[in-house]
């Protein structure tokens, strides 16, 4: 009788129930796909299925108008470490940004992040270093080991570039929401050896803070970088496994490692601790990354699906953190979210992507990146 008297309402209710049923099915299947992915033989098959399932789920939620608003950045959560040991006036931090991207293809979101930095910091030169142009900047640096991870090669490169030229090292996966001059304004009297971030949960002893390596601002020929490089550069010859085994044999290894997660991968952080313990007479201004650059990851306990929804679907807050650091995990569902039209133009990632790169543009080579002066992309 209801169908006969109100066919429009019946169809609307039926469609709504069908969509909710599909959404529930995808949510129930998602843990199964993740379990399957833990089996290496099935990972290649399961990963595309999982990505499509998650993106379809987000697309359905978007269709049902289930949008939220991202949490506001809360400066009250900040706990800066202003460490001043000496009264020396150091060299000015040069207006140079350094990034590294291995290979020749750059994902569309990385193109947009780089362009955003250049566009909003016109007085700075943004240099994207890659395997092809590395010799232009560091002609004496060579890598002979085939088993050295890209991450560890990048670690050597960032220290070498910062020591030789100074400036700001930024991972290419950073979304910069504040002009660099404003972010570095604390250094107006050139007193700091480094301006960077520290990870509070990894730091046991605040005399030796665990400094994050994805954003570091230093003057050229900085003694701290030189000392750090001396401890880390042997990885080129030793390899990561042998070097980590050697570090583990140190009598003070537990003190050095503090609570660094995955130390066999984060050897750069371990050697940073070595350098600090040898000579700790540096001035640092360190921001708490949990309250700033990885604020949103912490809010969702590093859940990739929740974070995808937050940065690609949800509305922007009134105030964003000055810097947002994204990882491969955070961008895990980006390609399928683009495919299904999940990303909203007024979301965090949408605002950056749609600023200068069409949504469906494929990954392009470094030489084809749509950089704007003064970006250096050779």
Where are these regions (language model features)?
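Glycosyltransferase-associated regions of secretory-pathway enzymes
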Residues: 37-154, 172-378
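Small-residue hinge/turn detector
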Residues: 155-167
């Amino acid at each position: 009788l209801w169908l006969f008297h109100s066919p429009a309402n019946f169809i609307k209710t039926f469609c709504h129930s069908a969509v909710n049923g599909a959404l529930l099915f995808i949510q129930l299947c998602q843990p199964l796909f993740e379990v399957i992915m833990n089996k290496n033989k099935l990972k290649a098959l399961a990963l595309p299925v999982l990505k499509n399932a998650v993106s379809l789920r987000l697309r359905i939620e978007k269709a049902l108008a289930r949008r939220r608003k991202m949490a506001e950045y809360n400066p009250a959560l900040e706990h800066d470490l202003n460490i001043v040991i000496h009264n020396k006036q150091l060299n000015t931090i040069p207006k140079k940004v350094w990034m590294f991207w291995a290979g020749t293809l750059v994902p569309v979101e990385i193109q947009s992040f780089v362009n955003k930095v250049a566009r909003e910091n016109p007085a700075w030169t943004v240099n994207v270093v890659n395997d092809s142009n590395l010799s232009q900047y560091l002609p004496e640096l060579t890598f002979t080991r085939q088993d050295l991870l890209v991450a560890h090669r990048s670690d050597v490169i960032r220290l070498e570039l910062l020591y030789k030229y100074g400036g700001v090292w930024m991972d290419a996966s950073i979304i910069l929401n504040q002009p660099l001059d404003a972010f570095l304004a604390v250094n107006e009297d050139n007193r700091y050896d480094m301006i960077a971030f520290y990870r509070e949960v990894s730091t046991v002893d605040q005399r030796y803070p665990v400094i994050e390596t994805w954003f570091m601002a230093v003057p050229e020929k900085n003694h701290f970088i030189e000392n750090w490089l001396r401890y880390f550069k042997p990885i080129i010859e030793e390899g990561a496994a042998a070097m980590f085994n050697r570090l583990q044999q140190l009598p003070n290894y537990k003190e050095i490692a503090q609570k660094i997660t995955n130390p066999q991968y984060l050897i750069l952080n371990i050697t940073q601790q070595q350098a600090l313990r040898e000579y700790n007479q540096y001035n640092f201004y360190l921001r708490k990354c949990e309250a700033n650059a990885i604020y949103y990851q912490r809010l969702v306990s590093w859940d990739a699906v929740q974070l995808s929804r937050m940065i690609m679907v949800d509305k922007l807050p009134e105030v964003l953190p000055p810097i947002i650091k994204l990882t491969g995990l955070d961008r895990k569902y980006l390609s399928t979210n683009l495919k299904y039209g999940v990303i909203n133009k007024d979301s965090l990632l949408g605002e950056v992507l749609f600023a200068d790169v069409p949504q469906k543009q494929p990954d392009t080579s470094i030489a084809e990146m749509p950089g704007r002066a003064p970006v250096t992309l050779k």
